[in-house]
Amino acid sequence: MAYSDYSDGADDMPDFHDEGEFDDYLNDDEYDLMNEVFPTLKAQLQDYQGWDNLSLKLALFDNNFDLESTLAELKKTLKKKKTPKKPIAAANGSANVTQKLANISISQQRPNDRLPDWLDEEESEGERNGEEANDEKTVQRYYKTTVPTKPKKPHDISAFVKSALPHLSFVVLGHVDAGKSTLMGRLLYDLNIVNQSQLRKLQRESETMGKSSFKFAWIMDQTNEERERGVTVSICTSHFSTHRANFTIVDAPGHRDFVPNAIMGISQADMAILCVDCSTNAFESGFDLDGQTKEHMLLASSLGIHNLIIAMNKMDNVDWSQQRFEEIKSKLLPYLVDIGFFEDNINWVPISGFSGEGVYKIEYTDEVRQWYNGPNLMSTLENAAFKISKENEGINKDDPFLFSVLEIIPSKKTSNDLALVSGKLESGSIQPGESLTIYPSEQSCIVDKIQVGSQQGQSTNHEETDVAIKGDFVTLKLRKAYPEDIQNGDLAASVDYSSIHSAQCFVLELTTFDMNRPLLPGTPFILFIGVKEQPARIKRLISFIDKGNTASKKKIRHLGSKQRAFVEIELIEVKRWIPLLTAHENDRLGRVVLRKDGRTIAAGKISEITQ
């Protein structure tokens, strides 16, 4: 309904329960205006308290989207925040800017910053009594303990793992325009996570922009930039469940300009789907002509992905030709084996992401079944979830808890010691009541609650859980925390775990790829580790690695393409320490990627922390 329909007065304005409901109320022009002005208004009110997103948007709406008038009005009614004294942290320096993993709710077509009710339902005793926070808390040194606390309701972890549904996170890779977002949008639609009404809306919006075939892709690509360019820019994660397993999709960009985003997505996934465009000459442009297919697979192998599904997409464009299927497989398989994948860990599935055949609901025709007798994509994913979940069956109370911080969620509450952090369990398990330490700030916190996100039908459910285990994506509600010194890329660990280092120099077991120039001492590059990127340089070339995987006595002056060596790396322009683990301590967290001049030049494992 248009704004003019309510122009007679504020009394005619409906009551909105949340920000999403208000966004749906706006017409397209109003929504675009709001997206243009709202971020500026929000940024200019960061020093004020007592507002939320909905109240700011309503104020903008009432002032006809006039930023200056809205600011003047709000500053008269809002109170300024008290400026806390900066705590003395274990880690020095200012925050390093990193890109966030965008967690997008598929059940809503317009993103918002609402928090699940459970995250903000509790206040401290002082808040309930109207007392102000005690500033003395923020001037103390961070509290670090090595004595674990007990869970509120202890669970037998081994029994929990055996009874829980398998969980699988997978990243979707492939050359630009291979159909990655369309494929994942079709899968979510077939699973009834997106309903027919929402799909019709996306159909209208895509037709307006002359991109009617993008309706499924727009389920995943929700920003204006992504829709206008027709490529995925950010990393979108979506959660869904079947009766057999739980899943997290990471839809990574395929365009060369956004390879760093793809690296961040790969680092969080258990396995990968490679989406291949089987149309005439399309595979060749992504594979032979310096496309992203090879680079994505090289990154996946380098970052510890061992299991692949090759989604042979757009098979309807070649009339489901077995010859075309086998032709592509014969070119791609030798390359995958050459870079480290085992043939037994690769599944090949013919599909059409747009029509849905071979994805989930729409069965293969009799003609296709004459030459392909394997499962569809969804069944292949479920089988992979069971296979990979067996690796977690050995989890017990003695495995160290390790957690990658992917997002820090702002809280509406004024409690100084509350932090809400989302991320992935890389090892072990965690239960409410247990304590953890966050690195590099080395602050010890108590886990108050654990939340998992799931989507059923048309709604998003945020549920509490008593246990989170390796592989789970969860939000932790922490007490006794300093959220201002927690960042994306930080690591949390059991309080009695002492293997995380904050160092400037370390040794890599490095493998180089195709490079324009050799690596020499002093060569600068960008180091990617997890969701962090950091300028670094070659400090020292130590030795080549021979075929027996041992250090060679041959003198090393420079490192060329496709060579292996032990190399000492030095981080430069360090604004904030990066928590480090060796690959021996954790195989996934100890892996890094090196990029220079827009190209991936090498990858490696941290073998030793030197200083």
UniProtKB/Swiss-Prot annotation:
Keyword Protein biosynthesis part of the UniProt annotation: yes
Phosphoserine: residues bearing it: 124
InterPro entries per record: G_TR_CS, GTP-eEF1A_C, HBS1-like_N, P-loop_NTPase, T_Tr_GTP-bd_dom, TRAFAC_GTPase_members, Transl_B-barrel_sf, Transl_elong_EF1A/Init_IF2_C
Domain tr-type G: 165-390
Entry GO terms, CC: cytoplasm; cytosol; Dom34-Hbs1 complex
Region (G4): 313-316
Consequence of substituting residue 517 to E: Abolished ability to trigger the No-Go Decay (NGD) pathway, without affecting the ability to promote degradation of non-functional rRNAs
Gene3D superfamilies given in the database record: P-loop containing nucleotide triphosphate hydrolases, Translation factors
Any GO BP: positive regulation of translational initiation
Keywords in alphabetical order: Cytoplasm, Elongation factor, GTP-binding, Hydrolase, Nucleotide-binding, Phosphoprotein, Protein biosynthesis, Translation regulation
Region Disordered, annotated ranges: 1-21, 105-138
Basic and acidic residues: bias regions: 126-138
Location of the region described as G2 in the Swiss-Prot/TrEMBL record: 230-234
Protein role: GTPase component of the Dom34-Hbs1 complex, a complex that recognizes stalled ribosomes and triggers the No-Go Decay (NGD) pathway. The Dom34-Hbs1 complex recognizes ribosomes stalled at the 3' end of an mRNA and engages stalled ribosomes by destabilizing mRNA in the mRNA channel. Following ribosome-binding, the Pelota-HBS1L complex promotes the disassembly of stalled ribosomes, followed by degradation of damaged mRNAs as part of the NGD pathway. The Dom34-Hbs1 complex is also involved in non-functional rRNA decay.
UniProt name for this protein: Elongation factor 1 alpha-like protein
Organism of origin: Saccharomyces cerevisiae (strain ATCC 204508 / S288c)
